[in-house]
Amino acid sequence: MVYLDSSSLLKLLWPERESEALRSHVATEEAVIVSSLAELESEVQLKAAWLAGRYRGSRWRQFRTKLAEFRDTDPFRFQSLPGAVFQTALRQHRAERRTHCRTLDRLHLAAMEELNVSRLITHDANQAEAARAMGFEVLMPGVQVTP
């Protein structure tokens, strides 16, 4: 089981350099958790890109349809988050020896804890660093990691 954050979820919707490697990796997983946070954040990013003129309304609707189709596609498992995720995020933030990360990234890490998932697929380097500092396994399909 692995948690898919919005940076990676978006790469499954529109083509980017890492998209093919990500698709191939996702196909090998038994369960890919998509939280309500990742779904919301992805929807917001899709709409923002449309409103900024990156693509037409018809393409935006196609992206939203594809995202909705993931709900009925293996290996995706869409999960709602409990309200406790905010307290978990605050506790993580306040903990000593943790790497700083942005609020939404912190909420993804709290979601992982709340959903009892220890593996993360992300394409966000800052979030990856914070996740590793917390002991999570981080996967970044298609990204060359330099030692």
What role is predicted for each listed range?
Residues 1-40, 45, 49-62, 134-136, ...:
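Short, well-structured N-terminal submotif of metal-dependent ribonuclease cores
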Residues 29-32, 75-77, 114-120:
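Short active-site oxyanion
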Residues 1, 109, 113-147:
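Acidic, PIN/NYN-like endoribonuclease modules and their adjacent C-terminal/linker elements
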Residues 39, 68-97, 105:
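Acidic catalytic patch
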Residues 17-20, 24, 70-78, 128-133:
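Noncatalytic, solvent-exposed loop/strand surfaces
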Residues 5, 105, 124:
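Acidic active-site catalytic centers that drive phospho-/nucleotidyl reactions
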Residues 8-9, 38, 85, 108, ...:
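Alpha-helix capping/helix-boundary segments
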